[in-house]
Amino acid sequence: MAPVTGPSPLTALGLPPVPAAVLDPYLDAAASCFARHGLRRTRVTDIAEEVGVSRVTVYRQVGTTEDAARLLLARELDRLVSSLLPTLLAADDADGIVAVIASAVDFAVNHPVMRKVLQDETDLVGAFVMNEFGTVLERLLLLAEPVVRRLEEIAGERDIDVPVLAEWVARVVLTMVVAPPAGPPEVFLREVLRPLLAATGAHG
């Protein structure tokens, strides 16, 4: 397999390092195939045909379809975090924080691959949550803590239990991804967070 970029904060999440840009054509092809065929039905030959290379080349560059899925997840998560961090740091009220969380949920549920899985491979979602819930929660916690700390800064509060609140936010986000609310995520989150925002005085 081709080398990946080194060191990345994502390695702390238990994910592979961010894939090198040279792999983008393969990961773009994998994403197209996953969105078209689903995770279970996609084969290395599908990815190879999408890129226009041999199956051997795909194996050499990204490995199996499972490997490609993990690398794609690492890349997409890195892109999500990179895009949200500036918005998070610029947020000056609770509505800004809610918008950051909602953006993460929107990114996940509207991602073509995730949308395909949620529509046609729901059994994979159930199995994934049952088998990997703890691992996924740990990953989300590392992303949720900066959000909660920013909320703490905005509110000027020092009584917020950051680890506990971060876990709560992570659990809410995970639930919203695998079972999206009927309405817009931002509206739902604002209602869910209303008691907390009122208690901290962080509401806009």
Enumerate the predicted regions with their spans:
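Short linear capping/connector segments at secondary-structure termini
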Residues: 86, 118-127
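Short, well-structured alpha-helical segments
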Residues: 98, 102, 159-170, 174
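Amphipathic alpha-helical packing segments from all-alpha helical-bundle domains
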Residues: 81, 116, 126-156, 163-167
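Short, basic, alpha-helical segments at the C-terminal edge of helix-turn-helix-like DNA-binding modules
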Residues: 74-82
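Short hydrophobic/aromatic patch on the recognition helix
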Residues: 51-62
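Amphipathic C-terminal alpha-helical segment
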Residues: 106-110, 146, 150-153, 166-186, ...
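Basic, helix-initiating cap at the start of DNA-binding domains
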Residues: 1-50, 66-70, 75
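Hydrophobic alpha-helical connector segments
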Residues: 71, 85-111, 166
